[in-house]
């Protein structure tokens, strides 16, 4: 994109990670072929280059993995918490040691900038394993009664936007509490989960405690519906989450759902404009807006609308879109052709409905899946771009006059995952935050995460909490 500064390329070396030409399923501590021999290709979204060929799990493979996890559960759950903690600490340290390798791998398979995988994702991944390792021998003091018991086998399905981080969010508390795991990564981003399987072997984790099944929706459905799975945890789209909720209804499975969002970022007239602009950019353009808690709705007080939008457009014009492995890149590739098509369709619908589109001027690479940072003005609550989760680098701008109007507009959504408040008045932050129906509310910042803090939503954003002490409950019989 156009910028006041020219940056020489500063690419991270791809050679730091060795991607095998093919990968199997990870079942009972071994990499094995799918029972029916099916495979699929995983592609770099920045170049459309085939990275590797991966075994595709089917129903028979799910059954094998669940049986392996059930066998492992008997010994794993009987281990003292201090012994389970040793494995988690070991995994965390190996992740730190291999963080550069994992960051490059995640960027290649997902498309997000290397700065984000290196500086945000990987430190948080290790932190989650360190954090829950600390809880493993303290479960009696977590507030869930004496001797809380693990549930059994956890079936976990994770999305493509934060593959390794979502894996850590789910596997770390499950193992700390004595459960065993069968995890299905997204079909577009299976590689980091398979590398994690190798880390489990490197850490000496007992066979069957963690099983990784790359595959498509049929494998996920088989896992969720397996009669010997005691716990289901899903992060992904609201539509799939609803289907999962229906499928486990009437069973004794425990369920956690973290689904879509349409987060409101509220900027009051006393907010420092430059600081707010940086928060807005972080809120919606981090990971190309492919974040469930993205601040995709900007609610700005009318009196500062023009000033803030001018500043925001100037800032967007300095963002650099391109090679995700370049350390200077701000905006990487969209994860898949299907997701790019969805973003394009919703943006075109926004224009057709009368919202005014502004996109940063930039040259999109000829190969790969790309979308320029975009914002819509003259948006009403009725516009599709104000209601639907686009899951891309697209910001919808609405205005308000009073705090009550801001709260009403922010809450006028089927989702309730996240929100942000920008103001210099602490009393206003507390008053507004208390009225927002959102699982997490950031004050004068956005998209900040910590393993000690619970995360989850209301309404169609799901239920249950991941992270913090609260994240233990999802994997305990309490």
Regions found by a protein language model. Give the residues of each.
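Glycine-rich loop-to-alpha-helix module at the N-terminal edge of alpha/beta enzyme cores
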Residues: 49-139
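ALDH superfamily catalytic-core signature
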Residues: 239-380, 409, 443
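Rossmann-like NAD(P) dinucleotide-binding subdomain of oxidoreductase/dehydrogenase enzymes
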Residues: 138-275, 400
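Residue-level signal for inorganic ion chemistry
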Residues: 48, 80, 84, 106, ...
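Structural signal for hydrophobic packing residues in well-ordered secondary-structure cores
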Residues: 73, 77, 92-99, 103, ...
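Terminal low-complexity tails and localization/encapsulation signals of metabolic enzymes
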Residues: 1-53, 86, 90, 127, ...
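Conserved C-terminal structural/oligomerization subdomain of aldehyde/semialdehyde dehydrogenase
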Residues: 47-53, 205, 229, 266, ...
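Short, well-ordered beta-strand elements within core beta-sheets of diverse protein domains
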Residues: 50-57, 72-78, 156, 265-268, ...
């Amino acid at each position: 994109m156009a910028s006041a500064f020219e940056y020489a390329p500063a690419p991270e070396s791809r050679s730091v990670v060795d991607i095998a030409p093919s990968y199997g399923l990870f079942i009972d501590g071994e990499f094995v072929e799918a029972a029916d021999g099916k495979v699929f290709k995983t592609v770099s979204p920045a170049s459309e280059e085939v990275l590797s060929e991966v075994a595709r799990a089917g129903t028979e493979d799910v059954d094998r993995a669940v049986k392996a996890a059930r066998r492992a559960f008997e010994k794993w759950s009987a281990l003292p918490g201090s012994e389970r903690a040793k494995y988690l600490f070991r995994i965390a340290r190996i992740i730190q040691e291999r963080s550069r390798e994992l960051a490059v791998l995640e960027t290649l398979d997902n498309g997000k900038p290397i700065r984000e995988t290196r500086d945000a994702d990987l430190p948080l991944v290790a932190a989650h394993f360190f954090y829950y390792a600390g809880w493993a021998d303290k479960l009696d003091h977590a507030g869930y009664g004496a001797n809380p018991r693990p549930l059994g086998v956890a079936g976990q399905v994770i999305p493509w936007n934060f593959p390794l981080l979502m894996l850590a969010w789910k596997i770390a508390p499950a193992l700390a509490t004595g459960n065993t795991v069968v995890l299905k990564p997204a079909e577009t981003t299976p590689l980091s989960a398979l590398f994690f399987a190798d880390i489990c072997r490197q850490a000496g984790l007992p066979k069957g405690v963690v099983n990784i099944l790359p595959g498509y929706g049929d494998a996920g459905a088989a896992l969720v519906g397996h009669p010997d799975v005691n716990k289901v945890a899903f992060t992904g789209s609201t539509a799939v989450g609803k289907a999962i909720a229906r499928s486990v209804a009437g069973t004794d499975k425990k369920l956690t759902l973290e689904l879509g969002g349409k987060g409101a970022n509220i900027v009051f007239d006393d907010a420092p404009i430059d600081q707010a602009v940086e928060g807005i950019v972080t809120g919606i353009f981090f990971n190309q807006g492919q974040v469930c808690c993205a601040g995709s709705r900007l609610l700005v007080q009318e009196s500062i609308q023009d000033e803030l939008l001018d500043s925001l457009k100037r800032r967007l014009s300095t963002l650099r879109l391109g090679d995700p492995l370049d350390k200077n890149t701000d905006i990487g590739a969209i994860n898949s052709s299907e997701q790019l098509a969805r973003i394009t369709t919703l943006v075109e619908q926004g224009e057709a409905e009368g919202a005014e589109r502004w996109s940063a001027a930039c040259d999109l690479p000829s190969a790969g899946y790309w979308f320029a940072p975009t914002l819509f003005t003259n948006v009403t609550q009725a516009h599709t771009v104000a209601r639907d989760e686009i899951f891309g680098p697209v910001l919808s701008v609405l205005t308000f006059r009073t705090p009550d109007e801001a709260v009403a507009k922010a809450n006028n959504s089927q989702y309730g995952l996240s929100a942000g408040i920008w103001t210099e008045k602490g009393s206003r932050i507390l008053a507004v935050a208390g009225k927002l129906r959102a699982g997490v509310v950031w004050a004068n910042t956005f998209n900040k995460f910590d393993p000690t803090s619970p995360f989850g939503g209301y309404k169609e954003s799901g239920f249950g909490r991941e992270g913090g002490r609260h994240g233990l409950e999802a994997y305990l019989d309490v």
